[in-house]
């Protein structure tokens, strides 16, 4: 038997670890919950456990309970790392608390930039759909430009090309899509034909013809009178 509440919290911590090792997350959550609610836990230990509990709630898709643990942890944490801020921003977004998600992401971005670091990809990534849903296309374009600069992915280039197109920045759209095309990341007939039409619009018919010719050779574009 445990002789003190402190010893009991250590036993619960061990049982939580064993439960986790056996892939029993509900069991681990049950023991971690006892620790954070116990008067026998040291404050620092309680704080660390609260963070773990929040992560486990998130892993079991109990997002409301997860963000509450993160909020209680953040109130007393000496340092809130970028990974924790990102997790909180993602939880707010899942819970449709979009303003809080944006605010948390902005803090994470500002803290990174203040240290001369590149912000985590997830902060910008999270903000794109929120601003898009709010029709703030200028902000979406700005975020995508940062993403292609620091975390270049073809999906970001394609999204950026689409944003340029919606703003009638035709040359910028052409350049963005060309980056994707030249790296073999346009794989549908619609995308490749759109690329060719962009070059026609830019009055470069020879390049457009070459793109269509290659598309047919690669069996992406159907050989038809319409496409010849």
Give the location of each predicted region.
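Conserved small-residue packing positions in alpha-helical repeats and bundles
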Residues: 16, 54, 89, 128, ...
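Solenoid-like repeat scaffolds
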Residues: 2-4, 36-43, 71-79, 107-117, ...
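Residue at a conserved register position within TPR or TPR-like alpha-solenoid repeats
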Residues: 19, 57, 92, 131, ...
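Structural motif corresponding to the intra-repeat A-B loop/turn of tetratricopeptide repeats
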Residues: 22, 60, 95, 134, ...
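Post-signal peptide N-terminal segment of secreted/secretory-pathway proteins
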Residues: 1-74
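Generic helix N-cap/helix-start motif at coil->alpha-helix transitions
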Residues: 5-12, 42-52, 77-87, 115-125, ...
